[in-house]
């Protein structure tokens, strides 16, 4: 359970804080799939948030189907994969209780939540998820069509890829690119490289790969979503962004950022 416990420590140390109150960490029970899967049996709602790979998600759903109670709702936090692909191998009773609930990072501060319904998802399930996220979690629920990337990432990931590719093509430094492609263009103050760090460089690589696999051949995304040698090299060297030892930037003990 060491990785899960370490994740809680990072959660408490994060700046800005990721919890509304530090004491709320006591509501989180760390665990790992191989040892604690039986604890899911009594859950009312399970949110899957594993790596953005269809094969891994499908394998997990097969295990979940045999472990959860008959009325448990299951949703995925996938940011790109259509629901029809996620549950194509699952029985009807699982599909009826399955949806996509995509939260944006950092979840505490980003109000948007994308809700996607499958062809067989029950209306009662969708209405429960919409109501809970609206009234209890205070989210702005947007019901999306079942298309790759939904709304936010279908546009946002394309924009990030264009920004990074153009910065490299034009020979801009990380600071120059983020100064231009930040607040002046209505992008968060992180800019594009800083946002890559915030999301996670390894996660972004999975997201880009996922969209590249499931979008049709003629889609414009393929012009900007190919393999990036710089990104691959950074991941190989452990530079995965804010959650690791740094990415395009590195946080210092003084609370400032250094460009790597």
Question: What kind of feature is each model-predicted range?
Answer:
Residues 1-260:
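N-terminal glycine-rich phosphate-binding loop for ADP-containing cofactors
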């Amino acid at each position: 359970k060491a990785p899960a416990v370490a994740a809680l420590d990072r959660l408490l140390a994060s700046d800005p804080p990721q919890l509304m109150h530090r004491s709320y960490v006591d509501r989180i029970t760390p665990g790992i799939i191989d040892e604690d899967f039986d604890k899911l049996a009594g859950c009312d709602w399970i949110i899957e948030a594993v790596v953005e790979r269809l094969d891994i998600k499908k394998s997990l759903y097969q295990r979940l189907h045999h472990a959860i109670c008959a009325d448990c709702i299951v949703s995925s936090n996938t940011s790109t994969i259509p629901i029809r692909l996620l549950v194509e191998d699952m029985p009807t009773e699982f599909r009826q209780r399955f949806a996509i609930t995509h939260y944006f990072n950092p979840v505490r501060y980003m109000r948007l939540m994308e809700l996607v319904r499958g062809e067989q998802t029950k209306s009662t399930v969708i209405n429960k998820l919409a109501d809970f996220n609206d009234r209890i979690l205070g989210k702005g629920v947007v019901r999306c069509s079942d298309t790759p990337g939904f709304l936010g990432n279908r546009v946002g990931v394309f924009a990030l890829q264009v920004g990074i590719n153009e910065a490299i093509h034009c020979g801009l430094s990380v600071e120059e690119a983020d100064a231009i492609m930040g607040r002046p263009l209505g992008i968060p103050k992180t800019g594009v490289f800083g946002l890559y760090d915030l999301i996670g460089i390894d996660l972004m690589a999975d997201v880009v790969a996922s969209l590249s696999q499931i979008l049709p051949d003629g889609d414009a995304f393929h012009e900007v979503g190919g393999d990036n040698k710089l990104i691959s090299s950074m991941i190989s060297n452990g530079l995965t962004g804010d959650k690791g030892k740094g990415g395009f930037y590195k946080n210092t003990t003084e609370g400032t950022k250094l460009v790597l």
